[in-house]
Regions:
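Pyridoxal 5′-phosphate
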Residues: 1-358
């Protein structure tokens, strides 16, 4: 079976992740800080998932009557949480849109800022298009207006070199089991220096109001921490650029072939190399579910049809009726698997243009 749904999880883990020796939280913080180029490991807070990390971050920093800019690239879970904060605490939300290529509308940001604007909430990488946000540009705008930038990094952690100090992100939320190739059940928050006290103070009334959220901050099992540490050590062993470039090359190869097929429309910004290894397509005459069924049943290829938990992004792209078919590549995929996937798509369309496989 060929697994091309790495945007959701990594099927194959590095040797040593499963069965790793237990690790301490301090060891895991040190490695996390090193991976994300943070000076102080104590600014890392572990949770049990990326979604928990985002929830704790928003609840800690966004309060009653605040206004936030929330990108349409962010997943439905983040939007649902923001809408809950709006309904219960009067938080105001302004959607931050994208253009036809899925690129964030940076020029609109300053005109949307209000006196009560607290934060710009924006995913670092898009799970639909594979686009990566220009965080240096976004955080420069935020700094001019003294706003926080809270970013869901679940698609970029382990998929590119995330240098938090250079990017200027205030609050970076991540998961360990997607591109970082660690075990399920671990995520976290990386805070800019000076924000830890504010984060803790912001959580006090939140945990009093909803004690169940305290479970998100319960210590992570040392065995899971061990697997997580082993995954990061694997990234260091291979080199972050080596880990990132292989999937990127595979995705580029898939894109170059599919864009030559008249019946296939590819979504996203492919005019830059600053991307994650995700390619989403629409195939004329077939629904995403039909494309997926063909890939899986005839060729054993796992891709992902539908809205990918990002319905607002699909609305912005004009693909909300059926969604798209997403192919997301990982470190353990091969060129042969990409060729097989291209061939499977050619078979679906009745093509025999072998140059597409050259």
């Amino acid at each position: 079976m060929t697994f091309l749904n790495n945007a959701a999880k990594t099927q194959q883990k590095p040797e040593g992740v499963r069965g790793a020796a237990p690790a301490t939280e301090a060891q895991a913080k040190e490695l996390t800080a090193k991976l994300f180029h943070m000076k102080n490991p104590e600014n890392v807070v572990f949770t049990h998932s990326g979604s928990q990390a985002v929830e704790l971050a928003l609840r800690a920093f966004v309060k009653k009557g605040d206004h936030i800019l929330l990108s349409v690239m962010d997943v439905d879970a983040t939007w649902e949480l923001a809408e809950e904060l709006a309904a219960v605490h009067g938080v105001e939300i302004s959607p931050l849109g994208v253009n036809v290529y899925g690129i964030l509308d940076y020029d609109a940001i300053e005109g949307m800022i209000r006196p009560n604007t607290r934060a710009i909430v924006c995913a670092h990488g898009c799970s639909v298009t594979g686009n990566i946000v220009n965080m240096e540009r976004l955080t420069a705008i935020a700094r001019r207006h003294k706003l926080l930038v809270i970013s869901d990094g679940c698609q970029t952690a382990g998929a590119c070199d995330v240098h938090l100090e250079e990017l200027g992100i205030d609050v970076y939320c991540f998961t360990g089991y997607k591109k970082m190739m660690g075990p399920r059940g671990i995520g976290g928050i990386c805070l800019k220096e000076g924000l830890m006290d504010q984060f803790r103070e912001g959580l006090v009334p939140v945990l009093e109001e909803n004690p169940k959220l305290a479970a998100a901050l319960a210590p992570v099992d040392p065995v899971k921490l061990g697997g997580y540490c082993a995954a990061i050590e694997f990234i260091f062993e291979k080199g972050i650029y080596g880990i990132c470039m292989l999937p990127h090359r595979l995705a580029k190869r898939f894109f170059e072939s599919t864009k030559s097929m008249d019946a296939v429309e590819v979504y996203g910004d492919f005019g830059t190399n600053t991307r994650i290894a995700t390619v989403s397509i629409r195939v004329e005459g077939f629904t995403p579910e039909q494309v997926h069924a063909h890939m899986l049943e005839k060729y054993g290829i796992v891709c992902k049809p539908g809205l990918h938990g990002s319905s607002r992004m699909h609305e912005a792209l004009g693909t909300s009726q059926n969604g798209l078919t997403r192919f997301s590549f990982g470190y353990f995929n091969t060129r042969m698997e990409v060729n097989d996937t291209i061939w499977a798509l050619m078979d679906l369309l009745g093509l025999d243009d072998l140059y597409l496989l050259a």
